[in-house]
């Protein structure tokens, strides 16, 4: 394949995942009130780490790397938990929890086959649904212009946000292939241009940003560790691994490569290493991006060279704050419109997982009902368990942790019950037959 074609296809992969890669640091940074300089650094270092994480996964060796043409980017599943952790304990606590969850993935990658039975679709589907629903209020606030903004809910903000949402919907309705894959990115560009004509774009951060910068490990301070935060991010890591497994299997079929348990172990370990790197570099947990799988199907090009090129492009972009500062031009309302579509898709992903189970089974419905309700309840009323001992509050202070544990425990309870009933029923049948 010609080098020019490899470079072009590499840029396509970068464009397909670019919106997802930059929107996570933008949302988290904006929610935690970072200034323009900090936001620009957060976005640029995230692009850099996305590139390195991708290269770690594509580079197959004895210890890590699945060796498939897969792109890694920030996981949306972690957005809500990171905002909650940052609001409660500060940015260093985010990186402490990301570091701990990354170590967990890297060290116990070989045991995920055994852990998977505790995280069937009814558990992972409930967790992803809870995470998606708890993110929606963040998107709605931004649609209005951002919490506390003087023009919150103004007609101009609503026109921008709903205009972007409509653009994304129409792009998915009337286009397929690559255009559909970058519909979010196109929506952000469209909304920013419209916002500029409405006087809602400030080019100051772009002008102030330098063209190149160095890397500053622990830019936001040395990681701090808090058990509730670590538990939350570890659950997020497990859910992300379950999602990645589906992407790995899909890519294995596309590339006609039969995956072994050892392949999956190296893939999981790479995600753990990427998260460890993310915590050191002031970035986020990483997971495989399914939109790039669709791009491989569209282009019919299965070469790892294309994805390796995309990884190096991201690394180069990560050293250029001026490129990252372009994302700071996006008006908050525009971001909110895109977030509605993106976070809604997180909810849809959770519902899709739940679609794999028997919804005619009353016990399954009860598990979903209780876990989602507990998760949302704790999110809405976080002080509900303030009078409980600290050792218990660790497990109940976060809606995602509380809802996830509810799903895990209820699934275990009903699964054990069903096995015992089945064994008793089988014994009774044997006695009757005798």
From Swiss-Prot:
One of its GO terms (molecular function) is xanthine transmembrane transporter activity. Disulfide bonds: none annotated. InterPro entries: NCS2 (IPR006043), UacT-like (IPR017588), Xan_ur_permease (IPR006042). It comes from the Bacteria. GO terms for cellular component: plasma membrane. It is a multi-pass membrane protein. The chain crosses the membrane at residues 9-29, 39-59, 63-83, 93-113, 118-138, 159-179, 181-201, 218-238, 306-326, 327-347, 365-385, 394-414. The keyword Transport applies. Inhibited by the proton gradient disruptor carbonyl cyanide m-chlorophenylhydrazone (CCCP), but not by the sodium gradient disruptor ouabain. Hypoxanthine, xanthine, cytosine and uric acid act as competitive inhibitors. The keyword Transmembrane applies. Keywords: Cell membrane, Membrane, Transmembrane, Transmembrane helix, Transport. Belongs to the nucleobase:cation symporter-2 (NCS2) (TC 2.A.40) family. PANTHER family: PURINE PERMEASE C1399.01C-RELATED (PTHR42810), URIC ACID TRANSPORTER UACT (PTHR42810:SF4). Uptake of the purines adenine and guanine, and the pyrimidine uracil. Transport is probably proton-dependent. This is Nucleobase transporter PlUacP. It comes from Paenibacillus larvae subsp. larvae (strain NRRL B-3650 / LMG 16245).
